Regions:
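A cross-kingdom feature marking solvent-exposed beta-strand/loop segments within repeated
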Residues: 79-88
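Short loop/turn motifs that connect adjacent beta-strands in outer-membrane beta-barrel proteins
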Residues: 20-27, 57-67, 103-112, 149, ...
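Short, charged, low-hydrophobicity "junction" segments
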Residues: 37-47, 148-151, 193-194, 303-307
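Cleavable N-terminal export/targeting peptides
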Residues: 1-25, 362-363
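Short glycine/proline- and aromatic-enriched beta-strand/turn motifs that initiate or cap beta-hairpins
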Residues: 20-59, 63-78, 113, 134, ...
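Outer-membrane pore/translocation modules
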Residues: 87-208, 217, 224-236, 243, ...
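Outer membrane beta-barrel transmembrane domains
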Residues: 180-183, 187-363
Length: 363
């Protein structure tokens, strides 16, 4: 999902010097995931995605770190209705992101520079278009929300300072993207898409609480006008609020995370408003120590409101198990989702299943 929910929290950093690091402290992370939803009438679709993201963190020294990430993804939309619609699939490598982080003054100031290398599938055929479109839905929150875009570059700075027992952080960034051809039209033409610039500002606070922490953050993203084939439109600005809390309680670890994404109304090329939307999410997890690891059942609730449509809602019951062994951190997880999905023709019952295996090797 493109929320970048962690962005607000990334502004806060502990105001303590980093331990000495080198390339020998490189760590590798992978997280194969499968997510599927079955949406009943009037939508009548099963939407599935399998992804294998890989992320490598390479610390050069205590102040300079590089990270590289990419993924393989395969998405599928299968119509379940009585019609003759064809199944839509799209798969392949996604874009590759390379980022450098340079810190100053005991990590009080962090300068970030990143590039998006278009190694993914940036152009969807007519047969692939439905699958490419469906995985971009913010409410359904697929792990990979697009298969590829053009070249892009991002630069940013974040500053964190202790204020008494609190840590306060703020930052900003700018992203510029090159044009690309996102799809093949039914006429065979390939419209050129030029994304507008993205400007982002972030602010966050965190504070120790018992054995854990309490953190809040706010991210504002402003988007310039997009141009596709000479038609100008705007997707609307986004506001992301986030709060998180974790602490020990009676031998268990309690985790509460909440976020809210508000997108202001955009505008299509005719001058018509697209309408605002809001997605709210809360997750409660309780971790129990046992069997050489931590077992964590969780409950997650999400609500999506749009103009001129009923609210969409879903709930997910999940379970994960975390264990560290021989330099590896392994976390398998699974969850079942149920709810309703608002569509033009009425509400559709929704159910789904997800499974993931997160693996980290290295320090």
């Amino acid at each position: 999902m493109r929320f970048l929910i962690a962005a607000a929290a990334s502004c806060t950093a502990l105001a303590t010097p980093l331990a000495a690091q080198s390339v020998f402290d490189t760590n590798v992370r992978a997280a194969p995931q499968f997510l599927t939803y079955q949406i009943k009438a009037p939508v009548n679709e099963t939407i599935s995605e399998f992804t294998t993201p890989i992320f490598v963190v390479i610390p050069i020294n205590s102040t300079l770190t590089f990270d590289v990430g990419t993924a393989f993804a395969s998405a599928r939309v299968k119509p379940n209705g009585p019609g003759t619609e064809q199944t839509s699939t799209i798969s392949g490598l996604t874009d590759t992101q390379i980022r450098a982080n340079l810190s100053f003054g005991s990590d009080f100031v962090v300068v970030t520079a990143g590039v998006n290398i278009p190694t993914g599938k940036e152009t969807a055929t007519q047969e692939e278009l439905l699958a490419a479109f469906r995985i971009g839905n913010d409410f359904l929150a697929f792990p990979i929300s697009n298969m590829g875009t053009g070249f892009g570059a991002t630069g940013g700075i974040a500053i964190a300072r202790p204020i008494g027992s609190w840590n306060f952080g703020f930052g900003g960034s700018l992203r510029q993207s090159a044009s690309y051809e996102p799809f093949v039209a039914n006429t065979g033409t390939r419209p050129r898409f030029q994304p507008g610039n993205e400007y982002r500002a972030r602010v966050g606070l965190d504070h120790p609480f018992g054995t854990g922490r309490f953190a809040v953050g706010l991210t504002y993203s402003k988007f310039g006008n997009d141009d596709i084939g000479g038609s100008i439109y705007n997707t609307g600005d986004r506001y992301i609020a986030q709060a998180g809390f974790n602490n020990s309680l009676g031998g268990a670890n309690v985790l509460v995370n909440a976020w809210n994404l508000y997108r202001s109304s955009g505008m299509i090329f005719t001058g018509e408003r697209t309408g605002a939307e809001n997605i709210a999410n809360i997750l409660l997890g309780i971790g129990f120590h046992g069997m050489s690891g931590v077992i964590e059942p969780s409950v997650e609730l999400r609500n999506w409101t749009q103009e001129q449509l009923p609210a969409s809602m879903l709930g997910t019951i999940g379970l994960r198990y975390s264990v560290d062994a021989a330099g590896f951190a392994i976390t398998p997880s699974a969850g079942y989702t149920f709810g309703r999905f608002a569509a033009v023709g009425g509400n559709a019952d929704l159910s789904g299943f997800r499974a993931a295996l997160a693996i980290r090797f290295g320090s």
